[in-house]
């Protein structure tokens, strides 16, 4: 009996990868229940097993652990699929279910004779790297990347590619519109730690983003206007790069966060004493490269209607290098736009007044 590890569909035919082999089988035309034993093909372009298969733009891509090749419908023979001349990569795939159709192309986690753990997307018949050195450094420290699972979705005009590494307990997301990566996680409030995000599958149906959670066996709706995660608290977090001035002492006078304020609920949140309070963000900083963190400061983001509320902190001490961290857990839409820092070194401002923090970081990077 043949065991099939993956199935896909192209031009009226179903394709199935034969498990632990470099062969695949094609069904009868428009009949996924009939599989002719004569319609089994062996890929001679690479000797190792097929790791992953993906259909995109009426082409069937087969990825081994070190190389890849695409087939197309030639219109001749039965079944009519043959290799595409020139559609051969000296790169393979390191994760069977990490391959995904993303932003009108294919994305996969690369593996080859030289190494592994790069995120690539197909650009024509070439692989284009989209992961960064920092992302790859993190992935290459994982116990395995072979169990990675990914899905793609589009929301608020952005195309996202979400990749979860179950053994490493981590989830990463790439934004094709900005070219930036971010981490996504499930916040365990009792332990005070993040774990991988609980969703590993997605479909868009009934005008809804529906995601599968293997932990509960349930399907949930993913919605930007829902501020809980499976009924649990969502903890958002942003962390800055290191702020330095040639390792000299920096005196930090003020940091202000440009946040849409006045979005508190009615009735208001209440504090530990039962008194009304506005939504809050939590500010911390580290002066030793994130090895240790100081006190947590709660910054008020304004009750409902306090749209002019400023979110800032003064008297910030000094350091030779500092990393800022902002986090939040209140179930409202925190829209954090920018941050502004007032700081001096040797009596001179380290940044021009009013300069955007992103531009400040660019200058010191």
Where are these regions (language model features)?
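Beta-propeller and closely related beta-pinwheel folds
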Residues: 1-149, 185-190
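Beta-sheet repeat architectures centered on beta-propellers
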Residues: 85-365
């Amino acid at each position: 009996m043949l065991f099939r590890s993956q199935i896909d569909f192209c031009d009226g035919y179903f394709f199935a990868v034969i498990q632990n082999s470099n062969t695949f089988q094609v069904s009868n035309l428009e009949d996924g229940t009939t599989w002719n034993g004569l319609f089994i093909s062996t890929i001679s372009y690479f000797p190792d097993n097929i790791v992953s298969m993906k259909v995109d733009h009426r082409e069937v891509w087969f990825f081994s652990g070190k190389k890849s090749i695409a087939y197309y419908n030639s219109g001749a023979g039965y079944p009519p699929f043959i290799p595409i001349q020139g559609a051969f990569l000296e790169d393979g795939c390191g994760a069977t279910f990490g391959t995904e159709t993303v932003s009108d192309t294919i994305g996969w986690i690369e593996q080859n004779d030289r190494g592994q753990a790069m995120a690539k997307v197909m650009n024509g018949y070439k692989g284009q790297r989209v992961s960064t050195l920092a992302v790859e450094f993190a992935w290459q420290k994982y116990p395995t990347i072979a169990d990675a699972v990914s899905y793609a979705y589009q929301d608020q005009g952005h195309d996202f590619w979400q990749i979860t590494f179950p053994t490493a307990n981590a989830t990463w997301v790439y934004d094709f519109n900005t070219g930036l990566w971010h981490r996504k996680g499930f916040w365990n409030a009792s332990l005070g730690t993040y774990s991988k995000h609980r969703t590993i599958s997605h479909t868009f149906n009934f005008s809804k983003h529906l995601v599968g959670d293997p932990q509960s066996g349930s399907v949930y709706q993913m919605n930007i206007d829902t501020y809980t995660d499976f009924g649990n608290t969502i903890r958002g977090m942003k962390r800055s790069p290191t702020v330095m001035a040639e390792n000299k002492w920096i005196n930090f006078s003020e940091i202000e966060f440009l946040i849409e304020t006045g979005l508190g609920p009615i009735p208001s949140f209440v504090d530990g004493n039962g008194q009304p309070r506005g939504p809050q963000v939590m500010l911390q900083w580290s002066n030793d490269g994130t090895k240790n963190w100081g006190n947590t400061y709660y910054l008020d983001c304004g009750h409902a209607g306090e749209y002019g509320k400023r979110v800032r902190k003064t008297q910030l001490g000094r350091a030779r290098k500092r990393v800022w961290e902002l986090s939040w857990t209140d179930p409202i839409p925190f829209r954090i736009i920018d941050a502004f820092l007032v700081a001096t070194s040797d009596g001179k401002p380290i940044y021009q007044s009013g300069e955007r923090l992103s531009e400040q970081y660019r200058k010191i990077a």
